[in-house]
Structure formats: C-alpha cells, structure tokens
Amino acid sequence: MACSIVQFCSFQDLQSARDFLFPQLREETPGALRRDPSKTSNWEDDSWGAWEETEPQEPEEEGNTSKTQKHSWLQECVLSLSPTSDLMVIAREQKAAFLVRKWKHSDKGKEEMQFAVGWSGSVSAEEGEYVTSALCIPLASQKRSSTGRPDWTCIVVGFTSGYVRFYTEGVLLLAQLLNEDRVLQLKCRTYEIPRHPGVTEQNEELSILYPAAIVTIDGFSLFQSLRACRNQVAKAAASGNENIQPPPLAYKKWGLQDIDTIIDHASIGIMTLSPFDQMKTASNIGGFNAAIKNSPPAMSQYITVGSSPFTGFFYALEGSTQPLLSHVALAVASKLTSALFSAASGWLGWKSKHEEETVQKQKPKMEPATPLAVRFGLPDSRRHGESICLSPCNTLAAVTDDFGRVILLDVARGIAIRMWKGYRDAQIGWIQIVEDLHERVPEKGDFSPFGNTQGPSRVAQFLVIYAPRRGILEVWSTQQGPRVGAFNVGKHCRLLYPGYKIMGLNNVTSQSWQPQTYQICLVDPVSASVKAVNVPFHLALSDKKSERAKDLHLVKKLAALLRAKSPRPDSFEAEIKELILDIKYPATKKQALESILASDRVSFSCLRNVTQTSMDTLKNQELESVDEGLLQFCASKLKLLHLYESVSQLNTLDFHSDTPFSDNDLAVLLRLDDKELLKLRALLEKYKQENTKATVRFSEDADGVLPVKTFLEYLDYEKDALSIRKTSEEECVALGSFFFWKCLHGESSTEDMCHTLESAGLSPQQLLSLLLSVWLSKEKDILDKPQSVCCLHTMLSLLSKMKVAIDETWDSQSVSPWWQQMRMACIQSENNGAALLSAHVGHSVAAQMSSSATDKKFSQMVLDADAEALTDSWEALSLDTEYWKLLLRQLEDCLILQTLLHSRASPPAAKASSPQTEPLPRLSVKKLLEGGKGGIADSVAKWIFKQDLSPELLKCANREKDVENPDEPREGIARSPPEVSEVETDLGAVPDLLRLAYEQFPCSLELDVLHAHCCWEYVVQWNKDPEEARFLVRSIEHLRHILNPHVQNGISLMMWNTFLVKRFSAATYLMDKVGKSPKDRLCRRDVGMSDTALTSFLGSCLDLLQTSLEADISRDEVQVPVLDTEDAWLSVEGPTSIVELALEQKPIHYPLVEHHSILCSILYAAMSFSLKSVKPLALFDSKGKNAFFKDLTSIQLLPSGEMDPNFISVRQQFLLKVVSAAVQAQHSKDKDPSARAADTHGQDLNWTALAVDLAHHLQVSEDVIRRHYVGELYSYGADLLGEEAILQVQDKEVLASQLLVLTGQRLAHALFHTQTKEGMELLARLPPTLCTWLKAMNPQDLQNTGVPVAATAKLVHKVMELLPEKHGQYSLALHLIEAVEAMATL
C-alpha cells in the first residue's frame, strides 16, 4: 500500500466565486455571462449583490498572462479551510466568500460533499484596509449529548489596518485592534493529549503576528468570549438591541527586537529546559557568575522567519506556577514586568446584516508591548525566509526561503538538520500517522515493545512539499528518510495545512468521540476539487534493506505486469507465480492476490493455478509461521474458483430437453382448466403488446456468461459457508443468469445445477432469491418462450426439496417462510407478466408438495385413528392456498392496470406538453398496497392526463353503469364539454382496456372516484405550469362530471383553498391597483402567469364557484357515498385518498361563495374585454371587501339592506360597459371569422345573461341592463336580435324613447351625410319640428351606419307599437314614419 491522493470534496460553482473576487476575469470567460441555470440554482441571489460593482477592466498585454491568471487566481487569495471540512474562506483585498458544506447524491447513489457559497460580500470596515490572513476555527460543543464534537465554526480575519475580526456565517461577532501595524499572520494551537508523561501540556492560543510584535490570546479566554458574543448577537437580533457590550478578552503582547524583518512565525508553546541546558543558557547570558535557580523556569518559545537573522528564536519567561490572569485581576496585573496582561479594548460591536455599516469611532488606546529580544538565530544575510510550518508534535519545523530551499529545523536545539533544493515558491505541511497495531507483523528475535501487537502505537511524521513551479506534490519521511510519494497535481493548486483541530477541548472531552479532521489537503481550482493525501505508516519504516519495501516493489512490479498491453502467454503465469512467492509479508501477499483476482486480463486457469500454488506454499510452511488469515483467504478463493469452473462446464454442455410441450401440459402443470388458461394467455398477450419496446442488444452481452473477476466480487466464503455480498439488483441478475439462465431455457441440466450449487454451500433461500431475480428481470424473453415455465417449475421443485428449504417441523397452521419469500418477490416486482407466471408456478409447486405430504400422512394413518391429522393438513393447505389465491388476484389486477397505463391513444387529441410526455412509473403490487385507497385511481388519473382523454370518453367506457344511473352532469354557465366524436377519433384498444379495468376494479375506479382523481391530477399539473390553461379547464370539466354533490363540494373546496385562492386574490389586488386589465409583465410578476392565461384562469375560477353553488343546493337530496374496496385490496395502507379528504370537508357557506362568484365574474369580464377604468374592489363596501378570500365554509358579515346610491351608480356603469363590450365583440366576430377563431375566452358565455344576473345581486336595475343591451344591438345593426331582446324588457315606454333617438340618428346620417339631391328635396318637405330634431341628432354614436332603410322603417313601426298614443313623442314618431316611407320610395 503506497501513498495516495484522494478527492474528498468538490466545489459547486468555483468559477462564480472567482468572478466575485476577480471582476476583471468575469468577461474573459464566456460561461461567466451565461452560466448554466442548473448550476446556479442553489446559490442565493441576495448574497451576490456585490457582483454588480464591476471594476473597469484593463486590457491584458499578453494573451498568455490572461490565460494563466484564469487558473492561478487562487494563489493571490487568502485561503483557509476548517479542520472539520465544514467551512472555507476565500478572501482577496476587501471581499470574502464563506463557503459551507453541502451533501449531494451522485449518479452512483452515494452522497458527495460539495462546497457552496453561503455568504459573500465586503468584510472591510475601515477605508483602504485589505484582508491579509484568515482562519476557520471550529469550537467544541458544550452539550452533554455532543461532547467533543464541533458546535459552530468561527472565522478569524486579519486586516492591514491591524484589526482582527471574528465572524460566524457572515455575521460579525467582534472586532479587536491590538496593534496599529498590519496583521501579517494568524495561527492557532488547540489542545492535544501529551503522548508521554514528560511532555509539557500545551494550552490553546491564537497568535497574531505584526511586523514588530506578537500578540497571543489565551484559548480558554477566547473560547468563552466567542461563545458569549455569539449568544449576545442572537439575543440582539431577537430584541433589536445592538448595544450589548461584549465580554473583555485577555491577551499578551510582545515587542520583538534585534531583527530586521519578520514574515512568518511559529508559536512553539511552553517548554522547560533540562538542568544542563539551563546552566548553559544562564552562562551564555550572564557569564560564569550567573545565578542558577533550583527549578528550571518555564518559557514560551517563538520562532520567526525573515531577514537578519534568517530565523530568530525568542524565549518569553513565564512563572512556572503563575496562571494566566483573567480580566478580573486587571488592576493588579497592569504593572507586572514579565508579561503584559490587559483586557482587550476597542470593541466595535457587531452587525446582524451581511454588509457592515460604517461606524465612526475613535481608535482605542494601544497598550505598549513588552520588549522581547532574540536569544539566537540562524544568521544568513542573503537569505530571506518566507514561511515556517511547525510539525504536529512541536519538535520539528520546516522553513521556506527565497532561494528555493526547504530547511528542516530542530526546534529544541535550534539547528538546521536537513535541506531540500529546487522548491521555489514552495508550500509545505505535515502529516502525522499513528501505527495500526493490527497491521504490525511480529518478527523472530524481536523482543522490543514495538515487536508485538500489544505494545504502544508508534507515530510517524511526513513532510509534504508542493512545488507550484513544477506542479508536483512530494511526501518525505523525516528526519532523514527518503521520498515516499510524488504526484503530478498541476501548477495552480493551494496546499492547506491548518496545524490545529477543535478549540475548547480538554484532557477529558478530547478523549471522547471526535469527528474526523483532515491534516492536510490540496485545493485544485482547475478541477474544482479538494484532495487529501493518505500516507500509510509503514512507509516510515521503509529503507533499502526493508523487507516491506521490497514487497511493495514486487507489488508495483506485479501491477505493471497486469497492466501490460500484450503479456506473453507462455511466461505470464510463471512470472506472476514468481512474484507472489517472493513476497514475504502476509498482508502484502494478500493485497497482491487480490489485485490478481480483480484483474480482467488474467485467465481462469492462471488464477486457479496461482491461488493453488500460494495455498500449497502456505501448507508446506511451519505451522507457527503460517498466517491464518491468508490461508483462509486462499482456501475460500479456491472454493469459489472450483464452483465457477463447475457451473461453466454445466453451461457449456450440449443439453437439450426432448420432451414436447403443449397447452394441455401447461394447464396441468399450473393446475388450471382450459378457460383459466385461455384468460391467462389473453391477458399476457395484451400486456406484451402494450409493453413492447425497441431495445438494442450487443453480441457480447450474452445471457448466462459472467467473467470470473465479477463472479469473485459477488460471492464470499466465510466460516465454511458461501454467501452473496450485498449487491445491486443488476448484479444479482447477472449472478443468477450465470447459474440459472441456461436451465430456464432447457439448455442445461437443472438437476445437476441444483446439486452443484447445494454442494458448494449456497442456501436454498439465496438460490431462490437469485432464481426469482433472473426470472422477473428477463420478462420479455420469458413471455416469448412459454416453455421456460416448465423449466421454472422443475427448478422450483428441486429447490423446495432441499434440506433447509421448508422446515418439516413448521407449524401447519402458519405460513411457510419459504413460500412467503417467493410471494414477497412477486409483490415487489414491477414486471407483472413474469411475476404472474412465477406466482402460478409457485402456487402449483406448493399445492403439489402439500398434496404429497397429505398423502404420505394419510397412508400412515391407522384405521381406528381419528381424522384430526388430516383436518390439520387441510387447514394448512387452505391457509397457504388462500395467500396464493390472493396474490394471483392482485397480480392479475396489477397486470391489467399496467397494460392500461402503457396503452396509447393514437393520434393524440392535442399537442402534448412536457409533463404529458414524461413516462409513467411501472406498477407493482407493493406500490398499490402502499398507495392507499386512492392509489389505483390515482395511477389511472395520471395516465388519463398523459393521454388527455376527455371526461366523455370515461363515461362512454363505463356505459353499463350509466344505464343504471342515467343522471347527467349538471350544466351551468361554463363551457359545455365537447362531444367524444369531435375529440377522440382513433383510440385503438383504449376503450376496451378501460372497460376491462372498470370490470376488474368496480369500486376503486367508480366513475365519481376516477373523475375526482383526474380533476386533482390536472389541477396539480396546472399549478406546476400555470401557462397551460387547458389543464385547469380540463380539471373543471372532470369536476362537473362528478355526480355526487358531496364529493363535488369537497373537491372544489380543496382545489380553491390549495391552488386557486392565492392567485385569485393576487389578481384582484393587481387589477384594483392598476384600474384596468393589467399587462402581461405585471401579470407574470404578481400572479405568476401571462395575461392570456390569467383570463382563462378567472373563467375557470368562475366555473368552479358556480359548480360549488350547484353542488351545495343538491347536497341534502343525495346521501354521502360509501367508499368500498375490492376484496383483493382490503389490506391497502398509505395516504388518505382524495375522495376521503373531499368527504371530510365542511359544507360551504352559500352566500359567501356567491359573493366570491360575483367578484370573479367582474374580474373575468374586465380581463376578457380589456376594460379600462375598472377597480373591482371599488364596487363593494367595507363589509364586502372584508369578506373576500376568507374560508368558504366560514360565516362572514356580508352586505345587506339598501346599498349606497353611489355604489349602485358605479356598478351600473360597469355592467353597461360589459354589455357594450360583449355586443362589440360579437359584432366583430360576425364580421371577421378569424377573430372568432382567435378568441377563446368566454366565447360560449352569454355575457348579457351574466350581466343581468350580476345586476340582480348588485342591486342594479335589471331592466336598465336589458334596455341598454337592446340599444347596443340596434346600434350595431343587429335588428333581428334586438327584436328578440325587446321581449325581455319590462319598461317598454322608456325603451321606445331610447329607440326613437337611435332611429333619428339613422335618419340624420342618411339625410345629412349622404347629401343627395333627392334627400335634400325630401328634407325640404319634412315638418320644421322634425328637421330641427333630426339636426340635433349625432349619427357618430351609431356603431353601424350601413343599416338598410327598410330595417329602419321596421324599427320605427316597432317604436310606434311600444309608445302609448298620449306620449309626448308619439307625434314625432308619426312624422318619422312618413319620412322613412318617403325615403323608401327614393
């Protein structure tokens, strides 16, 4: 086992984060402007508001530079990843993006971790400050149930202004100004249990490096402060008070002296010198007269890298018994000289918003730093240090410099012990590996504590170096070890080594369960992935003389041999044997054997010989030195190989059954009579026709053939028992086909195969599972070859006779687990044809075995014995037989239903939308049993939606029931459903299949139940895409075809509350706001659909409300229906059906629904005719407005009594507009047939009748509306329709006066606007009174001026009939008659 680099996480959309941090790169990438919406659907739009702040782009001087910057942008960012891999920070200049962990299902069904942006924006609060460093520190939970686990992650960010700010999920917790210089580096140390008793226990701390100072914050104090701040932020957000003072913070501040520049640092922690080192150090500092203390003092050690010296070592003396001071002892500690403890000042508060507000405050007072001189260093005037990385055990440190060197330091001695060359701009990190005691191999003569599996675990450290110039990642064994791994990873990656784990643990909580934390990882922006480096412990032990290293070399050589393109067949096996025998370590030898067995390039004979050779070699060794695990591994693989060889030989034998097969034989075999067999054949034939699909088969995809490599992966030998590993359904089918496919086709001996598999150790239950998986998955081939039923019967009989298949002591009154296993497989299968056949075979074999057992028991009975034993046997037979009969009925029902759902109406009635083209899921008995009482009707409703069949077709297919119940669906003002002959022209076998389904499911597919489910399915699909208005129209059609008013009321109420009322209220408020029919853009924004779809939606709402009113009227006349279920489906469980929910609904409050119907009619009319200056809610008083959009079953305070005349006037004007618009629309349709075809909204609606009905409810005079309608008809020249409409007018005298004016307008147009000679002569002969009256008329009010004179004469005579003789205008009417008659003679 060698080093490996494994991807453990990926980015959801790293390119978007790059565009946010580097706006100048946004337009350079074509995909940046038009990103795939599927990739960005999970990102929060509000979090990316800062993207709009585009920066001016400067043209690139070179194309290569631009291309390189696209990939190397991560090198310019500040990057930090939490050790628990739950949060990542990417920052640049003033911007930062916080990425959170998400889990996503991959195509293989496994969960994969991804990073997605949870927050982004600007993190700078001071003008001109930039981000310089960042850390993600997970904080331990304080709850008992999650001790040792992370509770939340704090983000620490350092700035050029000197501020250090602490965040959580985009919210600023606190900000601290500890020094006025820029923050160079942030580093953290968390608690680790000491490995040895003599090792000093290190405290947690956060260290902040400035150009001339180091500030260390005690970890315990920081942990408590952060927890308090987080709690206070939550309280402030809840109460709205942001002026909560955060708790103080204790810290130390050291001023570093005698060094030119500092770039990076490492805080080693508290150390104690040995007595010799103590005296040596005291002599060097104070000379030979220096006083020596009895106990060595404790010191905090710091190492810096930079220049002059290249590496500096600092030691801060501490009191060995002096604890860290808290803020309570602040006054006492202010004058201490050893270290400066003070309460952190300068709190800026925090913000609950994503973007911080600018707060103008004075900078806090800076505490002076305690001077700390460098004790010694590594002087090198030309060398400048760039970074330092401390090892996990605090004994070694790696330093990089500007010469391209990586130098390994001994921290305790302060010397360089190793140097690597050629690593310019290197990034470094450490990996610490603990030895696994189970992998330790004892060697002879080794008596050390590490030589046995009971000794302590050893720890190895490896240095990881990433060289971006070369794009290589190397792993080195320390201190003087070789390179143990190298990987080509690209030139634009970032190596992340946090060097800490979870903050807030102690020696107790750290011993509890902890989540896995990574030690080092590589972020690759090109592949948008995060990779971890895995190093096995034994690589630390490898050297040139190591046996393990030799074994690894042989394993690599073996892998290369297996990968060879054209291995020599004559020597291939010999070379493999030689390599296997040369490997010494059992674990490595097992790994080598596994690689050989997993290779698909090694022949079966070679695998068998190599495994046998390894087995023989182990047996020839001394018993004490033989590894039992390896011996068992070889033995188990040999048994599997022998089984594979035996099955392959049986499958290749030329075996053909010569027994003829007839229909009579099949009937006898399945225990069916001729009628039942014919019915079964007919059902399977219809099923096969409707389920025929064009499939592609390749020659190499031969059934019954399984590579030995795959065979070994599927099976396992453990404790002398052969078991099948947990595999997928496809893998079970492949293994079962290898065992049984030839037998099912009669091409292999069934008896020999069963004997071979039983001898190998496979249990009958496993064999039955494999047999059924093959049979049920190969449905198409089985239905094409009925002879396979006989082979299945034989195979099942042989399996059932195995020893442990059916327990002989099983209680005769219980169900056999053997047959229950087979029934469960049939119940769960979605291939209903194969499942039905297998159930018939199982029923036949079970009955045959029960009969033979009964005969055997009967033959052993003595003559004087009681017949009780025979009775018990028949009870057992009856119990199991009933289960088989129930399953056969259920499978038959499921088969008929599946046949129906796969049938198609040809050609389709209308253009199918995308939801109608989606395939329906296949059915199984299990799905129907778990689907609830409405599962069957729901499945058929989904199919009806796919085919878009009309409700009339469902009624015709159920014509026999219609004869018994001749009630027709009620018709209202809604559009009548089309005739079947107009829509369904060629439906093929659909009506017959529907009729068969009705017969099979008389209760589940009762017509009202089916219409209810269809209604609900259509409205659900409409809700997904409101632009498909025809879905909602079709839903209302199904609703109106429901005969039972209780069901109809419940369904309509559920539809209204679930899908319609929100959109209806939004449309109401929108139209009331704009005062007219809204435009398309406004409709889409507020209601979620176009203006055209909105018009149809309002019409459907009106139909639904009218249907509810009609259903409420007839509720008391009809009883509540009783929902029955077929006997075979009484055990169904699952969700409550739609019809049951509908019957649970309360009755509606009739006046409230009528009130909503009035509003809906107003909205529908305004949208249909695009009326202007219409505010729907202005037509109602305050009571009417308050009652809208309330629960339709509740009792609301509605308008009553006399209405304000102002409201009545406004309502009358609206209704007159509707009538005028309706007549105008009808007139335009009569003149332009194309307009009639284009207009589909309200084309069959009698708008005048609707207006009159609205006038009745709105307290407007109905006769005014009728008279206006008559006048509009005559104005458009529709005199014949006008004569019919006159009959409905009550006040004929007022109508006659209005028509008299219209007649005058017609004559005025004919006389004054034609200007003919005859007309002028006629005008001169008219009476002066009539001339004056005609001149006062305005012919422009006429909508149609081309009316014949004869029609006008008829209108004048009609006016004379309507006017009484005493009327003031009667004489004027007489003069008009004379004038019209005179004009007729011209």
From Swiss-Prot:
Phosphothreonine: residues carrying this PTM: 899
Highest taxon of the lineage: Eukaryota
GO cellular component: autophagosome; cytoplasm; endoplasmic reticulum; plasma membrane; presynaptic membrane; protein-containing complex
Annotated compartments: Cytoplasm; Endoplasmic reticulum
Composition skew (Acidic residues), residue ranges: 43-63
Biological process per Gene Ontology, one example term: synaptic signaling
Composition bias, Basic and acidic residues: 959-973
Glycoprotein in keyword set: no
Gene Ontology molecular-function annotations: enzyme regulator activity; GTPase activator activity; small GTPase binding
Keyword entries, A-Z: Cytoplasm, Endoplasmic reticulum, GTPase activation, Phosphoprotein
Sequence positions bearing Phosphoserine: 38, 448, 914, 976
Region of interest (Disordered), ranges: 31-69, 959-982
Pfam family membership, one: RAB3GAP2_C
Subunit and interaction comment: The Rab3 GTPase-activating complex is a heterodimer composed of Rab3gap1 and Rab3gap2. The Rab3 GTPase-activating complex interacts with DMXL2. Interacts with LMAN1.
The protein's role, per its UniProt record: Regulatory subunit of the Rab3 GTPase-activating (Rab3GAP) complex composed of RAB3GAP1 and RAB3GAP2, which has GTPase-activating protein (GAP) activity towards various Rab3 subfamily members (RAB3A, RAB3B, RAB3C and RAB3D), RAB5A and RAB43, and guanine nucleotide exchange factor (GEF) activity towards RAB18. As part of the Rab3GAP complex, acts as a GAP for Rab3 proteins by converting active RAB3-GTP to the inactive form RAB3-GDP. Rab3 proteins are involved in regulated exocytosis of neurotransmitters and hormones.
Similarity comment: Belongs to the Rab3-GAP regulatory subunit family.
Name this protein carries in UniProt: Rab3 GTPase-activating protein non-catalytic subunit
Species the sequence originates in: Rattus norvegicus (Rat)
